[in-house]
From Swiss-Prot:
Membrane topology, record value: Peripheral membrane protein
GO molecular function: ATP binding; ATP hydrolysis activity; proton-transporting ATP synthase activity, rotational mechanism
Keyword vocabulary terms for this entry: ATP synthesis, ATP-binding, CF(1), Chloroplast, Hydrogen ion transport, Ion transport, Membrane, Nucleotide-binding, Plastid, Thylakoid, Translocase, Transport
Cellular-component GO terms for this entry: chloroplast thylakoid membrane; mitochondrion; proton-transporting ATP synthase complex
Function: Produces ATP from ADP in the presence of a proton gradient across the membrane. The catalytic sites are hosted primarily by the beta subunits.
Organism: Convolvulus arvensis (Field bindweed)
Entry EC number(s): 7.1.2.2
Name by which UniProt lists this protein: ATP synthase subunit beta, chloroplastic
SUPFAM superfamilies per record: C-terminal domain of alpha and beta subunits of F1 ATP synthase (SSF47917), N-terminal domain of alpha and beta subunits of F1 ATP synthase (SSF50615), P-loop containing nucleoside triphosphate hydrolases (SSF52540)
InterPro entries in UniProt: AAA+_ATPase, ATP-synt_VA_C, ATP_synth_F1_bsu, ATPase_a/bsu_AS, ATPase_alpha/beta_chains, ATPase_F1/V1/A1_a/bsu_N, ATPase_F1/V1/A1_a/bsu_N_sf, ATPase_F1/V1/A1_a/bsu_nucl-bd
Family named by the database record: Belongs to the ATPase alpha/beta chains family.
UniProt: ATP binding residues: G170, G171, A172, G173, V174, G175, K176, T177
Gene that encodes it: atpB
Pfam families: ATP-synt_ab (PF00006), ATP-synt_ab_N (PF02874), ATP-synt_VA_C (PF22919)
Amino acid sequence: MRSNPTTSGSEVSAVEKKNLGRIVKIIGPVLDVAFPPGKMPNIYNALVVQGRDNEQTNVTCEVQQLLGNNRVRAVAMSDTDGLMRGMAVINTGAPISVPVGGSTLGRIFNVLGQPVDNLGPVDTNTTSPIHRSAPAFIQLDTKLSIFETGIKVVDLLAPYRRGGKIGLFGGAGVGKTVLIMELINNIAKAHGGVSVFGGVGERTREGNDLYMEMKESGVINEENIAESKVALVYGQMNEPPGARMRVGLTALTMAEYFRDVNEQDVLLFIDNIFRFVQAGSEVSALLGRMPSAVGYQPTLSTEMGTLQERITSTKEGSITSIQAVYVPADDLTDPAPATTFAHLDATTVLSRGLAAKGIYPAVDPLDSTSTMLQPRIVGEEHYETAQRVKQTLQRYKELQDIIAILGLDELSEEDRLTVARARKIERFLSQPFFVAEVFTGSPGKYVGLAETIRGFQLILSGELDVLPEQAFYLVGNIDEATAKAMNLKT
């Protein structure tokens, strides 16, 4: 083993006594570290590189492999620029631990739990390791219940499961960020819960934009940071694969504390779950593992399962997770999205066509799905209403080509009625959001599930056929639509 030229022999023996190792090899973000016999760190232990003259660098690594001959292979959580062979490495004796609790709300963290928002240190002594086992089966809450969001289109057609996992599909500029912020706002108001946002391998600009929009809409309260409703954790795409692979676990660890200790309902956002898989693939290649299908890591299912199994409801509280899913080349059979789908309870698909019409939230009512939409779970009334809404919209979709070519007048009386009701339904699925008040000037609306079902039943029954369709656009419950129609007449 080659020693650092600045370190004398007496210092080396002192280093060995202190249970330190030395870097023997550096390949990009991967370090090989040699330790004295009997002083080997465990898998997932955090190692901190010590600079020259015992100055601590900011490079933390995580042990991934035990190579034999008293050597370990570790993956760096930040850039390895400036590191050299022979540098001392401290074995912390524990996995990476991050701050947890109420003082994390309103703050932005990196993968190591260090605040990166220039607001000073986090006021807490409570930390938690990012590697934990999933809750035991006996701790789980197996009762199937709907997680009411107050958003009509979601609650009626693709309801979320409390403690479930939801995939959010949508391109740029269709309202994904606003939908996420509205959900954060509504869980705080209706459920007394909090949210954790994990930015996994996305653009730094997007993270900055989200933070600014959250401050503007009041989700993050700058005056009184403790009243904020969300903690943000970022591992952006310019960071090494180790950071992008572990940042999801950092966010999840913060969410678990709110669930298990504070006994709250928590919303965990992961944007983007595909980047988590991609980072794992990069790390796997760096560690020399043989790639599996389409070049992905052979441990893909295990890594995904380790993360997803910790996201669940327990008897204390729940973590409901909303995960943005990027589908490479729109290929749903790609191993990354295909592995993700196996864990999802619902999908919320955002449509560019609806956004172009000005219907927000631009949730596609026909493409969005949920395993919760069954009569034995949601009840016959909810199920029947949702199915009739979908049938009406599907028939309208089928008739659109005929309308475009021949016009409405060529349709039968029954089809014309279906089209009129479908257009009212389409507009009634829109809704003013609390977080968009600052942009639109319209006050936000939270619509309970019972009110949502009643409103769509009235449209389907034909009782509101005489009202103009613009009365249903961007309103809360059905009573507001009838009041708006009266105003339009006067």
